[in-house]
Regions:
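Glycine-rich, proline-tolerant flexible connector loops at the mouths of alpha/beta enzymes
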Residues: 29-43, 104
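Conserved beta-strand positions in the central sheet of alpha/beta enzyme cores
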Residues: 26-27, 97
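Short, acidic/polar
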Residues: 7-20, 37-44, 76-87
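N-terminal small/glycine-rich loop or linker at the start of catalytic domains
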Residues: 1, 53-68
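Glycine-enriched alpha-helix->loop->beta-strand junction motifs that scaffold or abut catalytic
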Residues: 21-25, 92-93
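Mobile, glycine- and charge-enriched loop segments
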Residues: 1-8, 44-49, 63
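Active-site acidic/histidine proton-transfer and metal-coordination neighborhood
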Residues: 67-133
């Protein structure tokens, strides 16, 4: 098993601490602001590697609010998403933990109508039904 941790923001102090705690790999969180330029992404990877932490996981993924909500600009976001994922693959990032929950308001990203919905095997989760709003 390999230990992967997030440091957000990835300051030098936090990355040193992750390495001291035994992290094998870095998780980069807050990709909404990630550049889609290959060299800029390579610089992010180099920052992690300075601390002996290969960048293997990108959590949250590029912005996809227009895609999820079917708004104008969705096609451009799809192209940007594809470009960033392609760059991440070339840089050795193996996992993109995407987040398909759109920003609903300035303060809320997720809207739920239930905190006791059932899913596979009877497990409980949160849920959303438009009819319950």
């Amino acid at each position: 098993m390999k230990l992967t941790m997030v440091a957000s923001p990835p300051t030098d102090r936090r990355l040193r601490t992750l390495k001291q705690l035994g992290a094998d790999f870095a998780v980069h969180y807050d990709m909404a602001g990630l550049p889609d330029d290959f060299e800029a992404l390579r610089a992010i990877r180099a920052h992690y590697e300075t601390f002996g932490l290969p960048w293997k996981v990108a959590e949250s993924g590029p912005a996809i609010d227009r895609i999820v909500l079917g708004k104008e600009g969705a096609a451009e976001q799809i192209e940007q998403y594809k470009r960033i994922v392609g760059h991440l693959g070339k840089l050795g990032v193996e996992v993109v933990a995407y987040n398909f929950m759109p920003q609903v308001t300035e303060d809320a990203m997720v809207v739920r109508t239930s905190f006791d919905a059932r899913t596979r095997g009877g497990a409980r989760t949160s849920g959303f039904r438009r009819s319950e709003l």
